[in-house]
Amino acid sequence: LKKRVNFLEEAFALLGIRDIEAVHGRAEEFAKNKAYREQYDLCVSRAVSNLATLSEYCLPYVKKGGFFVSYKSGSVKEEAAGAEKAIALLGGKIKEIVYFALPDSDIERSLVVIEKIKNTPARYPRKAGTPLKEPLS
């Protein structure tokens, strides 16, 4: 992971991007820190876990009125429906699902757009590993 942070820092410098910071650490730990919790307009994730788990990792970073956008593969309607209760518990609401195909292919992808409508309860995210082992439902 530190290699990724170093790469991002170099990319920011080369591109002249300012007022941005790449940090190394666990999402579950940083989300408990007031400097990061509910401070961002947008949080994005790639398809590394189910939507309920990703929401528990990401929604605590998003301030009210902001968005969490999850990049997922294929059709995600069933997964999204199964995660709605968890998303609501975490302060979010699914606003839309955008389906698209990657250029020059028939590979389907989707973006699940979740709006943050209320603050995430302080007990979330749970300790490291718990969201993955015991997803909210």
Language-model features: where?
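Conserved SAM/SAH cofactor-binding pocket of Class I
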Residues: 1-49, 55-56
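Short strand-turn motif at the edge of the Rossmann-like AdoMet-binding core
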Residues: 48, 71-75, 99
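Helix-to-beta-strand junctions that scaffold the AdoMet/dcAdoMet cofactor pocket
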Residues: 62-64
